[in-house]
Amino acid sequence: MILSARLSVAYGKIPNLHLRLLDAKNTSTELDSRLNILKGEKVKNMRDKWWQDAVIYQVYPKSFNDTTGSGYGDITGIIEKLPYLEKLGVDGLWLSPVYLSPQVDNGYDITDYRVIDTMFGSNEDMYRLIEAAHDKNIKIIMDFVANHTSDQCVWFQESRKGTDNFFSDFYIWQDAKPDGSEPNNWGSSFGGSAWTWDEKREQYYLHYYAAEQPDLNWENPHVRAYIYDMMRFWKQKGVDGWRMDVITSISKDQDFPDNARDLTTTNQQNGPRMHEFIHEMNQEILTPLDMMTVGESPAAKSWDAWELVSPEREELDMIFTFEHMHIDRKAGDVNGRWALQDRDLVKLKDILSNWQLELRDKGWNALYFENHDRARVISRWGNDTTYRYECATAFATILHGLQGTPFIYQGEEIGMTNPEFELGEYVDIELKGNYQHFVVEQQTMTQADFLAAVHKISRDNARTPMQWDDSENAGFTNGTPWFKVNPNYPDINVAKDLKAEKSVFKYYQELIRLRKTEDILKTGTYKLLLPEDEAIFAYLRQNGSKTWLVLANLSENMIKLEELMPLPDVKATVITNYRDRTNLSETLRAYEAVIVEI
């Protein structure tokens, strides 16, 4: 049943909402027909969805390709590069937010979900992109930010006015404690308190991220109805799926209990009604309209992920876990994610293996090392200078050999690196907030230690402009780029890599081709080898009589494999990043990767 949203105010009295108000009795005939297509059906078959055969490419539009000289990437720039993505061989294009936004958090603070920000173009440009991508058999996945909006959103502006209007409960408001302090000790992921006092309403509002990103109140059915209607709107425009930003944060404990430690974020995930809300969304929108989903789930572990992605649960198709991205983090440190240690490859193997085994036949993995929130993997965990090609292709081999849907972040396919700027050259609000919190206020980190961590893990490492060629500004813009270009662009760029003998792009092309032609990658079983080895990542994939050994030396050391394991007979070499590799008896060189049939 469609969630009713009978409203106590007229739509015409609320400016710039761009939302059709829902009512079960007056829903359009077109929508009714769509909802009836799959009514009552449950998707049980784990082998018939387009995204299970797909490789998906993420574009960060602001940094991808500028066609106007504004210094910001735009939608026309994405259309211009569709032949490049077609050449790479990807099946889906995930766009980070392009909605109307003040850009406090680079578009993850949305003012209007139905309007494209003029920074990127127009709604008509977006519709052209959808059509042009579909003409090349590339699906479009939009970013879905439903935990919070911008504080400039009309919903929030109306909500601030008082406690007795329709939008009053669209956000999470609480009275101050008797001493005027915050309702509890919850912290923001961007540093400081998760509560901000609003002088106009004379209450605190909740924000898990920036103060300019107030959290929506999913307990309010009208909020959910508005969100679902936005999803219908974009489906009608041709959007094929959603990447769901921090979707596991949408439910909050309504008792608002204190955390064990002040200003921490342990409360932010898996609230009491999370599964209920996501299931409702699935039944209202996702299943009836056949929309693919991948949800951001920071706290998910392999053993409980099935609750979100099992077809029988009718919630999401895939989730992005953060678990494997914490192998270089000091657990429990007061400095949170900025407290780093050397990468733990044994832990990485254990985590990825658990996800492979736990979700087999119960769900589907989303595979990634990089995205707009993650630093370049070769700079973070590998060698981005002497062995840049080998390192980039070795990590790619390990990831693309697993069962699941691989996600490639822009520039990953040419081996882009972290820039190592000076502290004042970074722009990310998370970085600035955490610097203030840990270095200035708590003084638990020195500026030098914080900058060293920034060079490894800051979100800005992934957000430098795409490096297309060796012309000024890496061919990204004819104007002044919104964010500094990595100075190494004359050496690392698309044009140069396409011509290189050792081309990261061409290696990715081959990995993608294998994904489309070799069923063993989709359906084969998984078995980890050498689980305690600190340099070698090796596993078997098996499908019927066919067995592949996926193997990578993720170190700069020369390693004799025969000293670690019995060497199988090799029937054929499937792919390798050292072209002279003919068998397994030879020494494995720095960041050497190979897939062989045995």
What residue ranges belong to the model's regions?
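Beta-strand-rich binding/interaction modules
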Residues: 558-578
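Short hydrophobic targeting helices and cationic amphipathic motifs
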Residues: 3, 17-19, 33, 38
